[in-house]
Amino acid sequence: MSSKVYSTGSRAKDHQPSGPECLPLPEANAEAIDFLSSLHKEELQMLFFSETLAMVSDTGEPQGELTIEVQRGKYQEKLGMLTYCLFVHASSRGFLDKMLCGNSLLGYLSEKLELMEQHSQDFIKFLILPMERKMSLLKQDDQLAVTRSIKEGEEVKTGVTSFPWSSIKGFISEAANLVLLRVMAWRRMVPSNARFLTLDTEGKLCYLTYQNLGFQTIQVDHQQAEVFIVEQTVHAEEGIPMSCQYYLLSDGHLAKRIQVGSPGCCIITKMPILREEDEIEPRPVFEKKPLVWEEDMELYSKFLDRKEELRLGHASYLRQHPEAHALISDFLLFLLLRQPEDVVTFAAEFFGPFDPWRPSSPALGSSHRPNPFRSLEPEGDARSGAA
């Protein structure tokens, strides 16, 4: 398998223009930044739910399904500190012209939809040359690091770009876009003349806009429902703009999604129960009972109580960390699709990008394939041994 490393984003690393070929980076306007600043925690609480849509062709034939989930989660920062965040997981799988395709998205966001970390992956099983693309976005100190890899057949190309954090105010990642659409549906409005920032398909910084297309009544599961239509447009640096229309119910559920120029669409098949307010269940309270060590029945009863408490605690942990289920689900999906000979190495390569202590990729290419396993030696000992 051949491997290539390419460098992109020279404008991003040296963002001061030095000539006519080096243009300044685009900037979000005040309307976009003010809209993001207006978000508050109580509003976001109403947006925590999952949904599933069917992917259909222009003739109505089923092609696959799309799942979107937004939950409250926890994010481990570089120094090991845990902070609360918005966890976004989306995935789709289906067929495109009878060829298997799919994608997956994992994102961690702040309450102002600032990006903490995001990983995306999509593939198309072309008969002659299968293609797979991966992109990772990570906030590193005062930089946004973007790592892209494209695999066509056995050839892999990798590129790393960094943007100054101060230059991406108003940046909307793929994960943030899914949350922002729910906010617009809840408010029933789109910020007027707002111009956000995003990345195009080539990983270049560009403008992102939203347009209010008004209200429409559609039929969902034999029911009439009013939807709020928002058109999102990515103004790529090169090529024509890419637009997508979202038909949103009053609480943010997605009823329909249309990619402008694409023959198919995603539609909801069952009318959800529209949310009005979020009900937070109180945490279970377990009373401490005095333990009489002389009585075996009391000791056994205490054992059973403690066992139940641990079981509920484990279930509560999984509810608070939905990324655990999402990661395992994506891993099993790609394991079934790829069917690698070495499952252990495949698992190490899949979960490697989520390791906070994983060393960064070298800037220069190498003929040696990087080892996906973490060294058992501490970094300091390894250096001293090499010396």
UniProtKB/Swiss-Prot annotation:
Database matches in Pfam families: CATIP_N
Cell compartments where the protein resides: Nucleus; Cytoplasm; Cell membrane; Cytoplasm, Cytoskeleton
Tissue spec. comment: Strongly expressed in round and elongating spermatids, weakly in pachytene spermatocytes. Expressed in Leydig cells (at protein level). Expressed in testis, placenta, prostate and lung, and moderately in ovary and brain.
GO cellular component: actin cytoskeleton; cytoplasm; nucleus; plasma membrane
GO biological-process terms attached to the record: actin filament polymerization; cilium organization
Segments of skewed composition (Basic and acidic residues): 376-387
Keyword DNA damage on entry: no
Matching InterPro entries: CATIP_N (IPR048777), DD_CATIP (IPR047501)
Chain intervals with Polar residues compositional bias: 1-10
Region of interest called Disordered, as start-end residue ranges on this chain: 1-21, 361-387
Keywords assigned by UniProt, alphabetized: Cell membrane, Cilium biogenesis/degradation, Cytoplasm, Cytoskeleton, Disease variant, Membrane, Nucleus
Signal peptide: none
The keyword Membrane is assigned to this record: yes
Pathological association: Spermatogenic failure 54: An autosomal recessive male infertility disorder characterized by oligoteratoasthenozoospermia. Semen analysis shows markedly reduced sperm counts and severely reduced or absent sperm motility.
Family: Belongs to the CATIP family.
Subunit structure: Interacts with TTC17.
The protein's role, per its UniProt record: Plays a role in primary ciliogenesis by modulating actin polymerization.
Protein name: Ciliogenesis-associated TTC17-interacting protein
